[in-house]
Amino acid sequence: MSDLTEGTHPRVFETISQVVELVADNRVPLATERLVALVAEFPREGLAHAYLAWVLSTSGRHRDAIEHGRVAVQLSPRSERVSLLFFRVLWSADERPQALDEMRRFVALEDSEEYAQIILEMERAGM
C-alpha cells in the first residue's frame, strides 16, 4: 500500500496502532478519545484524521466521520491508506456515489492494488 508518511511523527503511528487494538477489543469510546487528542495535537496529520473518521464511522457518527475523512484527504491526497479509509467511511454511511468518486480520484493519481481488488469484487457482484 502506498502511503506518504515521510515526516509523520512516531507518536501518530504508535497511537494508531493502539487504537486499532482498542477497536478490536470493542473499546471504541477510548479509541475515539485517543484519536481526538491525537488530532488536537497533530491537526495537520491526514492519517490521524483518517483513523478518527474510521472510528467515528464504526460508532455510527457518519457526519463527523465524513468531515474528518475529507480533511484527511485534503491533507494527504496521495496517501492510499487515507483514501481507502475515507472510501470505507463513505461506503458505510451509504454515500456510495461519493465513495466511488473518492476511488476514482485516487486511482487517477496512483496505482492501487487494494482498489483494483475492490473493483474486481464489485464487478463480480454485478455492481
In which residue ranges do the predicted regions lie?
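Alpha-helical segment of the N-proximal tetratricopeptide repeat
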Residues: 9-44, 51
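TPR/TPR-like (Sel1-like) alpha-helical repeat modules
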Residues: 87-114
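Conserved structural position within tetratricopeptide repeats
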Residues: 37-40, 70-74, 107-108
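Alpha-solenoid helical repeat scaffolds
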Residues: 16, 47-51, 81-86, 101, ...
